[in-house]
């Protein structure tokens, strides 16, 4: 495994560990570079029936754009549809880790997806709060 893949794997393992510490059931399922034919997101996390799916991408420069190839994006979007999960692009840049809802990504003319540096994302704590807000129950849920 080259240094770039090792660094990306380390970031994914760190996210998995942090989500697990927050009470999620988490699976790391990296498929890039494998012979796998069915695209799946890098991280699948579940908590009380709420599913979040994270496709991780990283860049060395803070201002660079992050691209997801059309074929890969279509596959993980279909996975999200089938699972009922919320799909996020996890973006790791120097000093930055954010999670962008996939629907906020821009499409290029060739159908690829791109995250510009201006797109707002959630930090890990905000992502956890988003999930916890979905699972919080009020008395109305039981009436």
Swiss-Prot record:
Write down the EC number.
Answer: 3.1.21.10
Cofactor binding: number and manner: Binds 1 Mg(2+) ion per subunit.
> What is catalysed by this protein?
Endonucleolytic cleavage at a junction such as a reciprocal single-stranded crossover between two homologous DNA duplexes (Holliday junction)
An example Gene Ontology molecular-function term: magnesium ion binding
* Family matches, as SUPFAM superfamilies: Restriction endonuclease-like (SSF52980)
Q: Where is this site: Transition state stabilizer?
A: 57
Residue sites binding Mg(2+) per the record: 12, 42, 55
Q: Does the keyword Endoplasmic reticulum apply?
A: no
Fetch the InterPro entries from UniProt. Answer: Hjc, Hjc_arc, Restrct_endonuc-II-like, tRNA_endonuc-like_dom_sf
Cofactor(s) the protein needs: Mg(2+)
Tell me the impact of changing residue 42 to N: No cleavage of 4-way junction DNA. Binds junction DNA normally
Q: How is its activity regulated?
A: Autoinhibits at very high concentrations, possibly because of extreme junction distortion. Inhibition (and activity at low concentrations of enzyme) is stimulated by dsDNA and Sso7d. Activity stimulated by PCNA subunit PCNA1.
Q: Name one GO biological process term.
A: DNA repair
Active-site residues, as the UniProt record annotates them? 32
Functional note: A structure-specific endonuclease that resolves Holliday junction (HJ) intermediates during genetic recombination; may have some degree of sequence preference in a mobile junction. Cleaves 4-way DNA junctions introducing paired nicks in opposing strands, leaving a 5'-terminal phosphate and a 3'-terminal hydroxyl group that are subsequently ligated to produce recombinant products. Can cleave all 4 strands 3 bases 3' of the junction center. Cleaves both mobile and immobile junctions. Modifies the structure of the 4-way DNA junction, a model Holliday junction structure.
Q: What else is known?
A: A second Holliday junction resolving enzyme, Hje, with different substrate specificity exists in this organism.
Q: How does it assemble?
A: Homodimer. Interacts with PCNA subunit PCNA1.
- Entry's family note: Belongs to the Holliday junction resolvase Hjc family.
Q: What is this protein called?
A: Crossover junction endodeoxyribonuclease Hjc
UniProt source species: Saccharolobus solfataricus (strain ATCC 35092 / DSM 1617 / JCM 11322 / P2) (Sulfolobus solfataricus)
């Amino acid at each position: 495994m080259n240094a770039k893949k090792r660094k990306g794997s380390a970031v994914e393992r760190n996210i998995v560990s942090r989500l697990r510490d927050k009470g999620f059931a988490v699976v790391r399922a990296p498929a890039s570079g494998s012979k796998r034919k069915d695209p799946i997101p890098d991280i699948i996390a579940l908590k009380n029936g709420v599913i979040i799916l994270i496709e991780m991408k990283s860049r060395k420069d803070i201002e660079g754009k992050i691209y997801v190839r059309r074929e890969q994006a279509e596959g993980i979007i279909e996975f999200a549809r089938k699972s009922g999960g919320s799909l996020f692009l996890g973006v790791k840049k120097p000093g930055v880790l954010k999670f962008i809802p996939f629907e906020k990504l821009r499409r290029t003319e060739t159908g690829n997806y791109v995250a510009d540096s201006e797109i707002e994302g959630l930090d890990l704590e905000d992502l956890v709060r988003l999930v916890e807000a979905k699972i919080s129950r009020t008395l109305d849920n039981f009436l």
